[in-house]
Each structure stands twice: as C-alpha cells, then as structure tokens.
Amino acid sequence: LTCASKLSSYAGYGPDLIYIPEHTFCLNEFLEDVKNIYSKKQKVLVAVSEGIRDEDGNYLLQKRLYNQNDNFGHLQLGGVGVVLAEMVNKELGLPVRSVELNILQRSAAHILSKTDITEAYNAGKYGIKIYLKGYTDKMVTISRTSNSPYRVKYTITPLASIANYVKPVPNSWINERGNNIT
C-alpha cells in the first residue's frame, strides 16, 4: 500500500516522501527532508510503511508505549505514523497530523471497483469449493492470464509457502536516499 501511494503522484497529489522497510530509515535524514520540503511548500505528505527500521535494525514503532506480538511471534506492526508525527512536532515544531489507513483500507467498500468485488467473490467461492473437496492449509491465489481482455484464474497454494514470508521491493525501485519510489 505504501508503494502504491506513488500512483497518485501522476495526478499531482502523491506523497513527497515514501519510506518502506527495504531501506534503512535514518531519523536525521527524515527530519532534514521534512524541513526542506516544508520550507518550500508549507506542507509535507509522507507515506510510511509500518515495518521501517532504524540504523540499528530496530522497528521505529518500538518507540511506542504499547507493543505486542502477532501469532508468528513478530512485533505487531502499527502506529509508526504517530511516532514520526511526534518526532516532527518535537524536533521541528511543525504542526502534524497522522492518519493510519489500516482500518480505512479494510472497510472502504464504497470505493471498491467492480473487478475488486468480482475477484473477491470468486476467490471466496473457489475457496469453499476446494474446502468441500477436502483441501486444507491452502490459500486461494489469483493469477492474471491475459491483459486484453483482462482475465484471471484462481488456484490454490500451500499456506506454508505464503504465511510468514516476505517478498521485498527490489532495490532498483527505491531512490538512492531511500525516501521515495522511482
């Protein structure tokens, strides 16, 4: 989702800065970037992935007062925007607001496309079908088979090959400073 925020830049509304876990986050560089952009535009829009880590390899969100682990024993991600907002306010004295999209993105059915709705419905239908055939520990996957016309197929993949794995964003997609997507 954080990388996808870059798409709005093509219409002139995208974030000024984008931070993702694949690049080490440097607080001093971040504050410098925010200060520079704010001095030019009087506003700064930042998109941040919850999993960003500092130079010591620690999740930035660990600076929160409350932390817990997920079912795999990993730190439950969330709230990094608030941490950064507090730092910007404290260090730069700028007015800040943090918006966390985690719940909004899951509950905004009013902005779903017809394709989103159709594919979600068909994935659920396919999942029930394979379950009734006796399959368990599988995940329904959607693969595009054609762009024109647009077509997809539904298959199953062992859950063990998906859960608890990360597919990183290629370094070639991240600018040298690590504060945006190319």
Predicted regions mapped to residue ranges:
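Accessory alpha-helical/coil subdomains and C-terminal extensions
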Residues: 1-97
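C-terminal non-catalytic interaction/assembly regions of soluble proteins
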Residues: 62-182
